[in-house]
Swiss-Prot record:
Keywords from the UniProt entry: Chromosome, Developmental protein, Differentiation, DNA condensation, DNA-binding, Nucleosome core, Nucleus, Phosphoprotein, Spermatogenesis
Protein name: Protamine-2
Chain positions covered by the region annotation Disordered: 1-76
Lineage: Eukaryota, Metazoa, Chordata, Craniata, Vertebrata
Low complexity composition bias: residue spans: 7-20
Expression sites by tissue: Testis.
Length: 92
C-alpha cells in the first residue's frame, strides 16, 4: 500500500511564483493512490463463479448430484425437500 507523504510547514516554500505552486499541485495529483493501484491475485468475481467450469462434467446419477448440492455450497443451507421425486430419464 502506498501512503501519501505529508510535508511539514518548514519544508514547503512560503514564497515563490504561482507557477511553482501549480507544479507542486500537479505532482501531488500524480502520486499513486491506493484505489488506483491495480490489484493482482484473487478478486471478487461474483457468487455464481464456481458453477461455470471450462471442463465438461461426467454425468452422474441424480441421487449423487442432489446429495452433494447442499454440501458444496459455502453457506450450508438445509436440503430442500422435494415432495414429488422425479426419476432419471436416461436415453439409451
Amino acid at each position: 500500500m502506498v501512503r501519501c507523504r505529508v510535508r511539514s510547514p518548514s519544508e514547503s516554500p512560503q514564497q515563490g511564483s504561482g507557477q511553482q505552486r501549480e507544479n507542486e499541485r500537479q505532482d501531488q495529483d500524480q502520486e499513486l493512490r491506493p484505489e488506483d493501484v491495480p490489484v493482482y491475485g484473487r478478486t471478487h468475481r461474483g457468487r455464481y463463479h464456481y458453477r461455470h467450469r471450462s471442463h465438461t462434467r461426467r454425468r452422474r446419477s441424480c441421487r449423487r448430484r442432489r446429495r452433494r448440492a447442499c454440501r458444496h455450497r459455502r453457506h450450508r443451507r438445509g436440503c430442500r425437500r422435494i415432495r414429488r421425486r422425479r426419476r432419471c430419464r436416461r436415453r439409451l
